[in-house]
Amino acid sequence: MDGFDKTMKFSIQDEKQSVHVNDVLLTVYDALQEKGYNPINQIVGYLLSGDPAYIPRHKDARNIIRKLERDELIEELVKSYLKQHREE
């Protein structure tokens, strides 16, 4: 039971990964928009469920987004949000 009380440390990879995540999100966003979907709703659906059916195959978006773990995508979104709002 003692092992359950310990805080786990989550390590972050270097900033090179951030650029890649940014490119993936923008590519997927554009593909969703071109297909007439609400990109935010679809990306959130994918991030929450892990179901790739939220992302179309258009422009290979489904394969592109699946190259990254969902936690990497969420991490980049949180970092970007906090950076933008802490500078205001």
UniProtKB/Swiss-Prot annotation:
InterPro entries: IreB. It holds the Pfam family IreB. Belongs to the UPF0297 family. This is UPF0297 protein Bcer98_3100.
